[in-house]
């Protein structure tokens, strides 16, 4: 292979897209986790003054929101592991890592928004009707799975980008 061909497929700016994917995975998934935590926390603080014994059961949406940031962290670490200043990094790998970061980031962002809304309203209604607990948890699981789908696609993309 000639140097011209290597430079054509691995330009100097290719790692930028990998770093952007790493940043997108962490920033967007953390933003989703923060939105879910904040919106759910508002509902929890609202019921805490009336029924303090329900606070521990009401923390489920907050915990589920925190898991979203872990999904982004996993993908960001894997993408960062594929970046090296001494090895050739192709434009294909850069775009693949960018796509992986955006997949998990936006999936976790939307998942966090859904968890926040369901958590806020669900916790407030749970205070009045405790039988709603199982239904609320099921809806929260379905919202959480959206972020998991994004992480699965990001892991598949990362595997393809590593040249395996």
Swiss-Prot record:
SUPFAM superfamilies: F1F0 ATP synthase subunit C. It is found in: Vacuole membrane. InterPro entries: ATPase_proteolipid_c-like_dom, ATPase_proteolipid_csu, ATPase_proteolipid_su_C_euk, F/V-ATP_Csub_sf. The record marks 144 as: Essential for proton translocation. The chain crosses the membrane at residues 16-36, 59-79, 98-118, 136-156. Residues 37-58, 119-135 are cytoplasmic. One of its GO terms (cellular component) is membrane. It is a multi-pass membrane protein. V-ATPase is a heteromultimeric enzyme composed of a peripheral catalytic V1 complex (components A to H) attached to an integral membrane V0 proton pore complex (components: a, c, c', c'', d, e, f and VOA1). The decameric c-ring forms the proton-conducting pore, and is composed of eight proteolipid subunits c, one subunit c' and one subunit c''. Proton-conducting pore forming subunit of the V0 complex of vacuolar(H+)-ATPase (V-ATPase), a multisubunit enzyme composed of a peripheral complex (V1) that hydrolyzes ATP and a membrane integral complex (V0) that translocates protons. V-ATPase is responsible for acidifying and maintaining the pH of intracellular compartments. Belongs to the V-ATPase proteolipid subunit family. This is V-type proton ATPase subunit c'. It comes from Eremothecium gossypii (strain ATCC 10895 / CBS 109.51 / FGSC 9923 / NRRL Y-1056). The lineage of its organism: Eukaryota, Fungi, Dikarya, Ascomycota, Saccharomycotina. The gene is VMA11.
